[in-house]
Amino acid sequence: MKKIIALMLFLTFFAHANDSEPGSQYLKAAEAGDRRAQYFLADSWFSSGDLSKAEYWAQKAADSGDADACALLAQIKITNPVSLDYPQAKVLAEKAAQAGSKEGEVTLAHILVNTQAGKPDYPKAISLLENASEDLENDSAVDAQMLLGLIYANGVGIKADDDKATWYFKRSSAISRTGYSEYWAGMMFLNGEEGFIEKNKQKALHWLNLSCMEGFDTGCEEFEKLTNG
């Protein structure tokens, strides 16, 4: 699961008695001090919703100089509702981005458009995302394009542009799953994000409907639920 998606779906646990623990394939190497294994293990725990274990392994990897792990630490600090720390997250994300982490660029951009981190800087955020979105071999390109689409769909800090939003969502979906980006945008407008996205039922319906039209079943389900609710 992408990092930006986890902001909406954090703390969702999947209890499967017969399944291995998240990232178990990385555990041996992580315990032996392999910083990339530590990062991948942290990322696995983050995606599964265990922020405590994610932070433990991300910190180990970051201490060894892994820039992506530093970006993940920043993401954790803007995800955990118990200990939100946007200023510290910004410091970590800047460090990660300066070290060349595309994940760091996306996370920093997300922080820069949220008022909880101070005065928003949309031009810098958009520049970071445009840069990250060009590396299609990197998973962060999916998140970068989704966030660009959301910024244009939201129309705060910059002029709203649904055509640009649609273009970025489709580009993101083309390298992930068709209709998912529009679904994600719809759910963001449905639930809101403090400091960035205000709840907006009409925008939620618009993007969920487009997701459904793209063939994303969950988008259809949420659109129907919201329409009839």
UniProtKB/Swiss-Prot annotation:
Endpoints of the signal sequence: 1-17
Pfam families assigned: Sel1
Transferase recorded as keyword: no
Keywords: Repeat, Signal
SUPFAM superfamilies: HCP-like (SSF81901)
Disulfide bridges in this chain: none
Sel1-like repeats: 48-66, 85-101, 143-173, 180-215
InterPro entries reported for this sequence: Mitotic_Regulator, Sel1-like, TPR-like_helical_dom_sf
Name under which the protein is recorded: Sel1-repeat-containing protein YjcO
Organism the protein comes from: Escherichia coli (strain K12)
